């Protein structure tokens, strides 16, 4: 048994060390998107760093996934026993973190610091990120190793948290299409790619609609209660809009749906009418006009239904609740 386990164990150890080394040397200049720090240095991120960070990370992840799949496949063929938990989940979680971190940080920046350049970068990189995510979630060797471990007598010796992790992975992979074959698998992956693009379009419409909405306030009574810092931001926005003499003390103030402006208004402003106006504008954002998301939402709902049926569910509600504590019957 030890002779059979040693190659897989060696791969597992190598994987855990290779990520840090490969990512550290992926680019000649330190890239903050690859920084191994407790808090990401977002202030140092520039658009030109995104593409090399994501692409180098994906390249490392592709190779690491191949190594893991080969090791697991060899183990599954050579030994009828279960693959130990330590040789499946730790390298798998390391893989999730390594390839997902730069893309996740970029997605956050895209949401809070949107620009045409960042949108173009997202459009260029998204297909490769989605494709790798599909390959990872539909990996037969990983699924088979997890399934064998779940069905083995040694599963009972795992901690409750470890058992939960194995079962959650199995469920996530089933919902990710691992059991689909042939035309169904191709259709599922095609729909997932379309859904990713639609989700991006939805977010873009929301950002554009938020950016298009604003109000200029001129009376002090209208902004009573709003913190001074928020008023300075609103006055600065007014100056940029052409009100050169705008000040935090005397206005005018330009308020928008940006969180740094809207949140203080909704929390502290004594002007009930202004709070209601901004709340309703935020609640109905991208529901009409040039950035209307109505058709995008219809397509998203349609694809969700198609995916649910491909996975054996009657509707998307059942699919969504499959990962939640409440059952479908409990909420319908």
Language-model features: where?
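Classical eukaryotic N-terminal signal peptides for Sec-dependent ER targeting/secretion
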Residues: 1-10
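Positively charged, low-complexity intrinsically disordered regions
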Residues: 4, 17, 25-26
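Zn2+-dependent metallopeptidase catalytic domains
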Residues: 21-332
């Amino acid at each position: 048994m030890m002779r059979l386990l040693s190659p897989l164990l060696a791969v597992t150890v190598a994987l855990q060390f290779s990520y840090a080394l490969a990512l550290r040397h992926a680019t000649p200049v330190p890239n903050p998107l690859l920084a191994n720090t407790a808090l990401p240095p977002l202030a140092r991120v520039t658009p030109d760093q995104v593409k090399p960070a994501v692409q180098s990370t994906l390249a490392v992840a592709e190779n690491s996934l191949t190594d893991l799949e080969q090791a697991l496949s060899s183990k599954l063929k050579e030994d009828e026993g279960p693959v130990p938990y330590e040789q499946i989940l730790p390298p798998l979680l390391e893989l999730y973190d390594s390839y997902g971190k730069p893309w996740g940080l970029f997605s956050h920046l895209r949401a809070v610091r949107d620009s045409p350049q960042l949108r173009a970068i997202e459009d260029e990189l998204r297909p490769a990120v989605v494709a790798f995510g599909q390959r990872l979630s539909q990996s037969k060797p990983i699924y088979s190793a997890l399934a064998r471990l779940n069905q083995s007598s040694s599963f009972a010796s795992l901690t409750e948290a470890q058992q939960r992790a194995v079962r959650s992975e199995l469920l996530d992979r089933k919902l990710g299409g691992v059991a689909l074959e042939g035309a169904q698998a191709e259709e599922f992956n095609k729909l997932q790619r379309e859904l990713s693009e639609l989700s991006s379009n939805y977010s873009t419409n929301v950002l554009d609609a938020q950016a298009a909405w604003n109000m200029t306030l001129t009376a002090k009574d209208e902004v009573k209660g709003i913190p001074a810092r928020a008023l300075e931001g609103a006055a600065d926005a007014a100056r940029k809009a052409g009100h050169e003499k705008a000040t935090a003390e005397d206005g005018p103030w330009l308020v928008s749906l940006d969180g740094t402006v809207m949140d203080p208004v909704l929390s502290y402003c004594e002007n009930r009418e202004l709070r209601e106006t901004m709340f309703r504008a935020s609640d109905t954002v991208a529901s009409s006009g040039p950035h209307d998301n109505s058709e995008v939402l219809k397509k998203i709902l349609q694809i969700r239904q198609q995916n649910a049926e491909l996975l054996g569910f009657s509707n998307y509600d059942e699919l969504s609740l499959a990962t939640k504590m409440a059952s479908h019957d409990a909420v319908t």
